[in-house]
């Protein structure tokens, strides 16, 4: 039972790597899609807003879906909304 589970996980891992490589080759990109999405998330400096746990004085200082928490020290935290 354990061996069949390990073999199944290994096969799924190989299939994931193989399809990711095929997708990467198809798009002609040098970065995986998940890395590009992470870059978009962390581009707070270009948007003139504070990222998660960044210092703030009002809600407008924080990025989208973040709000300024007034507890000391003040910081940007998730405002419980979804994109």
From Swiss-Prot:
Chain positions listed as propeptide in the UniProt record: 22-47
Domain text: The presence of a 'disulfide through disulfide knot' structurally defines this protein as a knottin.
Record protein name field: U20-theraphotoxin-Cg1a 1
Gene Ontology CC annotation, any one: extracellular region
Coiled coil: none
Key word Signal present: yes
Subcellular localization: Secreted
Primary location group: secreted
Cysteine pairs bridged by disulfides in the record: 49-63, 56-68, 62-76
Keywords linked to the UniProt accession: Disulfide bond, Ion channel impairing toxin, Knottin, Secreted, Signal, Toxin
Tissue expression remark: Expressed by the venom gland.
InterPro entries given in the database record: Huwentoxin-1 (IPR011696)
């Amino acid at each position: 039972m354990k061996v069949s589970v390990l073999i199944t996980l290994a096969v799924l891992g190989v299939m994931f790597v193989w399809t990711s490589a095929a997708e990467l080759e198809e798009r002609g990109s040098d970065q995986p899609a998940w890395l590009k999405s992470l870059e978009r998330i962390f581009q707070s400096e270009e948007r003139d807003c504070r990222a998660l746990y960044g210092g703030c004085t009002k809600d407008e200082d924080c990025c989208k879906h973040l709000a300024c928490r007034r507890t000391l020290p003040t910081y940007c935290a998730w405002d419980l909304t979804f994109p």
